[in-house]
Amino acid sequence: MPAPSLSFIISPIVGEEADYLLVRSDEYMASLYPAESNHLVSSESLRSGDALFLGAFETAVKGSCSVNTLKGQQQERGQCIGCVAARFYRAQGYAEIKRLYVNEDYRGKAIARSLMAAIEAGVVAEGIQCARLEMGIYQPEAEALYRSLGYRVIPPFGDYLLDPLSQFLEKKLIKNGGGFFVD
């Protein structure tokens, strides 16, 4: 009998349910980069600041992957298996994507792609049409994901300085009726 496929929902993180993922992410980043090249933010700052913090939560529903984002959650949330955040810099006209991470046991199941679609929709819902991010150069899987989603290389932004271990990416999000598309 085949194993049931994964089912998950994406909804806002309101407590500490993603903290264990951020600890794992911090450990992974520390193994790749020196402290001065790590630009990590706490889950508390993402829950309390001008930000949107989303989690992918496993559900008990058996069947294909299902993603319910942001509103109308009817399914009970299980373990948080992935997360992503956006910090809003409204005066500067962009949101910074932070802390995309998926539990190692759940990778390869389109969870990161689903989280990115949800966070981009959340950015557009806030009236912001540009998403930016900083990432390290030793993460080829993450870079491939971002590029496949339409992110392009840009110079350092915000408070970031040029760092040979960092790269900076941007995606223009343009509202198009009920959805959005890439410019």
Which positions does each model-derived feature cover?
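Acetyl-CoA-dependent GNAT
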Residues: 3-98, 103-105, 116-118, 122, ...
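Residue-level marker of alpha-helix boundaries and capping positions
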Residues: 9, 109-110, 133
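Active-site acidic-Proline motif in GNAT/NAT acetyltransferases
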Residues: 103-109, 137
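Short coil/turn segments at alpha/beta junctions that flank glycine-rich nucleotide-binding fingerprints
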Residues: 109, 126-129
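C-terminal "cap" of GNAT-fold acetyltransferases
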Residues: 16, 129-132, 136-183
